[in-house]
Amino acid sequence: MTRLGFSSSGSATSTLNLKQALWQTLRRVKWRVDSVLDKCGYTLQKKVEGFSFFSQLLNERIKTSTEIVFVQIGANDGTSFDPLYPLIKKSPRQFRGLVVEPLKDKFELLKRAYADIESVIPVNMAVHNTEKEMMIHRVRPDLEKRLGPWARGIGSFDSEHYKLSYLHNSLMVTERVICTTFDALLAAHNISNIELLITDTEGYDFEILRNIDLAKHRPVYIHFEHGLPVGLMSWEQYKDLIRYMTQHGYNISHESHDATAFLPQALQL
């Protein structure tokens, strides 16, 4: 867990720890506000001329596209803090793809969210580069409502991930999930020519994205969670991933907790 104060390792480390602790505190405040707003049917979003850069890109694409083929890894319940769901509900005929969620209770909610959209297929699996099964560490389902909407979205392969939210381990349980690789997922559902890829896996985004052959798969848009302020992805991992993406022709738009990689053609479509 992040600690405040100075240590013998030097002021740079102490400053980083302080920034991480402050960011985590602000994140928890936002989660509390989100909880209150969620009960009233509202959602809190950072305002950047009304939309995030990612949303702006997709809104422009929707105006000219007849079909956006997509894969969303870590879809959760389909609606909570989801950048894609509002766009699909607004223009359902223009999206075709997979929403992937390994946790059983979240998957049932995900199926319900997309029940009226035949072109969106919910998949009850996790994406992992090597393993057929993994344990996901998550908040106890009976406590999620009490803790607030933020608690729905912190399930992770990482057994220490919950500490970023200052939770006690007594609030956590593990759930065994079935895994598949990215390529096997696409093959199983006959998905090719992906235009949009979204990952939100609470700490495994780097491993998934770095393992994708971007010479073979060329999503025009890749939206992912880096979580640098709280350590979901290390700075070295982030730099390596950005280098890999830029070497394959992608531009990068960096936001506080997420990033969007996009091919130059995204601005011409």
Question: Predicted segment positions?
Answer:
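Phosphate/nucleotide-binding beta-alpha loop and adjacent structural elements of enzyme active sites
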Residues: 2-269
